[in-house]
Amino acid sequence: MQSTSQLSRPLNGNLELTLTIPWSRVQKAYDSAVDEAVADAQLPGFRKGKAPKDLIEPKLDRNHTLSHALGHLLPEVYATAVKEHDLKPLLNPQIKIVSGKEGETWTFTATTCEAPKVILPEKLKALDKLVAETKVVIPDLLIEEEANHRLAALAENVTTLGMTIEQYLTTKKLTAEELKAKLAQEAKSDLVSEFTLLEVQKTKKLPDRKATLDFLQKLV
């Protein structure tokens, strides 16, 4: 029995794959992980990798070994699903387990996103006006990723200035949640602009970002 996948597209722009893996395949991956551990094990009286499997396996942490096995199996199952549904993910997936009991089928969700569909207005305009009239749904996952990058960069800059992030928040009169919301809004706004530029560049067959900006600056 092979693994299967189902694709859903939530309104937030993300992609969600439901990955279903039969126990037989999980067991096979687990057995391979055990064999790997046996090959790397060293017991008194035996050369490395030569100790019998029945002596090594009882000493293994089953949950740890199973996690190791899934670490090899899930990327394969995910890659197959991406190919099956002809997806072009922008980000590595966020994988969560839905159900997983020994002897039963295991189910996971893998959440990722593609570049959003951009619908430009019939008449192109200067960038600020163009962005306001462009229809595009930026995936939540992409906004979150960009906001996290900005937060990490901010934290690094604040540390360089000899402050803690808490001190920075106090000076700006912001809570941590307000800062995250602010960065997310900025990230969303910038992503809308960038994807709008990319669509104009593609539509007008312009060579690069600078040429696209120059083209839009000439428009009224």
Predicted regions mapped to residue ranges:
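Short alpha-helical functional segments enriched in proximate histidine and acidic residues
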Residues: 80-81, 194
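Extended, domain-scale alpha-helical bundle/helix-rich regions
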Residues: 73-74, 81-114
